[in-house]
Amino acid sequence: MAQKVEAQGGNGGNQWDDGSEYDAVTKIQVAAGGNGIEYVKFTYVKNGQTEEAPLRGVKGRSFEADPFVINHPEEHLVSVEGRYNPEGLILGLTFKSNKKTSDLIGYEDGTPFTLQVQDKKIVGFYGFAGNNLHSLGAYFAPLTNVTPLNAKKLEAKGGDTGDIWDDGVYDNVRKVYVGQAQYGIAFVKFEYVNGSQVVVGDEHGKKTELGVEEFEIDADDYIVYVEGYREKVNGMTSEMITFLSFKTYKGKTSQPIEQRPGIKFVLQGGKIVGFHGRSTDVLDSLGAYISLSPTPNLHGKWTKVDENGDGPGLRCSHDIAQVGNKIYSFGGEFTPNQPIDKHLYVFDIESRTWSISPATGDIPTLSCLGVCMVSIGSTLYVFGGRDASRQYNGFYSFDTTTNEWKLLTPVEEGPTPRSFHSMAADEENVYVFGGVSATARLNTLDSYNIVDKKWFHCSTPGDSLTARGGAGLEVVQGKVWVVYGFNGCEVDDVHYYDPVQDKWTQVETFGVRPSERSVFASAALGKHIVIFGGEIAMDPLAHVGPGQLTDGTFALDTETLQWERLDKFGGEEETPSSRGWTASTTATIGGKKGLVMHGGKAPTNDRFDDLFFYGIDSA
């Protein structure tokens, strides 16, 4: 709620009030006559739309000054200085913004007054007017209602009814108050910090007898993650927020995060420095402002790669791998649970052209989905995947110099047959982790040595690394890392396996952590593991539906165990849209190493056929 500063002058004429719901004042028109100020007229901006208020006073044979124009959002109105006479008429006015001051309009006689509040801006006016302007008062709002260039406004999630509110942007969030209603969240209120000043925000919604929960953030900590659920409840025509949990950079959580009814949403991507949304008697929606780090440890950029020729087309649940200047694609589906083909597609990076690779030898007998593929040298290695009747493929190699397939291990002789597992490789070993067999999810890790041509069953990881599918699997500095996945619900734990010691270790990560997810794109880039998108909540129809998919590019530093978000909002970068079940690999394009991904499942349950590359500039 804006701060109302008392009107100065008299109370003759009629009372008027432009209101306080605007974002800023953008233009002021004033006319002065023999008795002082004859009229004022203000133009405001609200949600990007210009709104002209009525003329306050009467147009006569007066001198109309040049309009005082305020260049929102870089400029804002700070104060008004004026004078009024004993009869209660405003004689003169001067307006000041943070960048300039208007000329005096009217006379310098009379009693002086000033409308100003430190660290706030004027967002509305009110007063009395008849044939002249009798009095003038103002509404003030925090300066932080203007989004700074280094902050990003995240769209509010939830319903589209209720009053719009916006607390603006601050240095930090100090406290969070959440009030409960019978079916969800009744109200929220936030306390912020601006420099040494504590700013108490308004209550959004309405308190009930069910109480209020308070979450305090330490002075050296900040919120990086909000998880919520939205749902239409009790016959409502629009969604409301039914659950909220706040998590800080140091891992402090306001509420235990667990699966709940409704549609899950997350607000994340950096330090959260403000909130906005809609409310009625309940909290209808919630969005946030995030402060983006100006100097990420890993620098890169997304580009969409042009594609020509006969390629894989629209599909998901396939895999890709790079050999030299070519990217290979195998497996996948267009219709849920229906494999498309068993072609091996090859993309020439130089010509940007897809084609179907010639193939001889032990060509895989099954068209499959949920397959994995990696490369070592000039050879591709393909394991698992299933057809529509849940028959599984074995373990194959493909020599890209001779275009020959070889069946290295039949289904019945190798690791447990599976789909939606994860694969990675180093110079001599292919690693296969997790996935879904005919009867259960798995948490085993097997390695195949390409020199000895033998499988090795790695040590059992223990209870902390639950059986899962759709995890990220990358080899970084000799360790095999398992990142996130799905074990019946989305998880966010991270583990690594040391092949030398045959030992598993779970690690605690921190920073701007991505939310729980699976079936995301991933790549190993130096000491970092970079991921994009994925599924954050399973669809009620399981693999038949799209699930709840997300976007976002994150990097985990495997030495410091710190996560950071890499996306550059706006500018020339063409960031991929939300997706999961995409094919991805570590690749080099145009001399840059990065994450390349193809296709995937869209939130609409459609399929993508695009090719994106996140190329690293420096690390």
Curated annotation (Swiss-Prot):
Cysteine disulfide partners in this protein: none
One GO BP: glucosinolate catabolic process
Consequence of gene disruption: No visible phenotype.
Kelch repeats: 326-374, 379-425, 429-478, 480-524, 528-583
Further comment: The proton donor differs depending on substrates.
Organism: Arabidopsis thaliana
Name of the top EC class for this enzyme: lyase
Tissue: Mainly expressed in roots, and, to a lower extent, in seedlings and leaves. Observed in seeds.
Protein residues bound to Fe(2+): 535, 539, 543
Catalytic activity: a (Z)-N-(sulfonatooxy)alkanimidothioate = a nitrile + sulfur + sulfate; (Z)-phenyl-N-(sulfonatooxy)methanimidothioate = phenylacetonitrile + sulfur + sulfate; (Z)-N-(sulfonatooxy)prop-2-enimidothioate = but-3-enenitrile + sulfur + sulfate
Name of this chain's protein: Thiohydroximate-O-sulfate sulfur/sulfate-lyase (nitrile-forming) NSP4
Cofactor(s) it depends on: Fe(2+)
Similarity comment text for this entry: Belongs to the jacalin lectin family.
Binding annotation for a (Z)-N-(sulfonatooxy)alkanimidothioate: 386, 419, 441, 470, 519, 581
The protein's role, per its UniProt record: Specifier protein that contributes to constitutive and herbivore-induced simple nitrile formation. Promotes simple nitriles, but not epithionitrile or thiocyanate formation. Converts allylglucosinolate and benzylglucosinolate (glucotropaeolin) to their corresponding simple nitriles in the presence of myrosinase.
Location of the Jacalin-type lectin domain: 2-142, 151-292
The enzyme's E.C. designation: 4.8.1.5
Keyword Repeat among UniProt keywords: yes
Single GO term (MF): metal ion binding
Active site (UniProt): 386, 441
Keyword Methyltransferase recorded: no
One GO CC annotation: cytosol
Keyword annotations of the record: Iron, Kelch repeat, Lectin, Lyase, Metal-binding, Repeat
InterPro entries, per database record: Jacalin-like_lectin_dom, Jacalin-like_lectin_dom_plant, Jacalin-like_lectin_dom_sf, Kelch-typ_b-propeller, Kelch_1
